[in-house]
Amino acid sequence: MHILIISISYFLGSLPTGFLFGKFLKNIDLRLTGSGSTGATNVLRNVGKWPAFFVFIIDVGKGLIAVKIAQHYTNQNLFEVLAGIAAISGHIWPIWLKGKGGKAVATGLGMFIALSWKIGFASLGIFLIILAKSKIVSLSSISAAIFLPFLMFLDIGSTNHPYFFISLVVSILVIWKHRTNIRRLLKGEELKINDINK
């Protein structure tokens, strides 16, 4: 059962939401357009606001549902975390798109809302505050990722817990996936949310 749920979590995470919206609505391959990501930000810039909104909601749902399925069948924190990791892995490295997917932000948010809604919404709050000030999605995502392990530690009071471990892993993973964005930020070349193309 555990292996089955982990597999389901991966395939759930690997649903290429942004790619499908790009293909069906604009006949474009997001992997070859803009930032090359299939996430909501690239959808926003190249497909439209409403498609981006739906992609974001669905991608959040992928992480949330994967963890909720695990929670339904077990009360083991480690197993919940493994299901979340599987969903995030599917989102970043989807088998359908030869391993080229999104950057784990929305799916990771869904996972943390399921694991600890306080941490999930606190991270979302940090993201929205930075976004309101900077208008730069990548900076907002990176900022939320940096704060994530600290928020989790404050919530559970321990570094020896699967939730803290996954918060640290996801933080590092999100920052790593934004490494090209970081280079542009340092050069002052990163575009803002209302810019059309990267």
UniProtKB/Swiss-Prot annotation:
It is a multi-pass membrane protein. Coiled coil: none annotated. One of its GO terms (biological process) is phospholipid biosynthetic process. Keywords: Cell inner membrane, Cell membrane, Lipid biosynthesis, Lipid metabolism, Membrane, Phospholipid biosynthesis, Phospholipid metabolism, Transferase, Transmembrane, Transmembrane helix. It is an enzyme of class 2 (transferase). The chain crosses the membrane at residues 1-21, 50-70, 77-97, 111-131, 136-156, 157-177. Pathway: Lipid metabolism; phospholipid metabolism. Its main location: membrane. The keyword Protein transport does not apply. Its EC number is 2.3.1.275. One of its GO terms (molecular function) is acyl-phosphate glycerol-3-phosphate acyltransferase activity. It is found in: Cell inner membrane. It catalyses: an acyl phosphate + sn-glycerol 3-phosphate = a 1-acyl-sn-glycero-3-phosphate + phosphate. Probably interacts with PlsX. Belongs to the PlsY family. NCBIfam families: glycerol-3-phosphate 1-O-acyltransferase PlsY. This is Glycerol-3-phosphate acyltransferase.
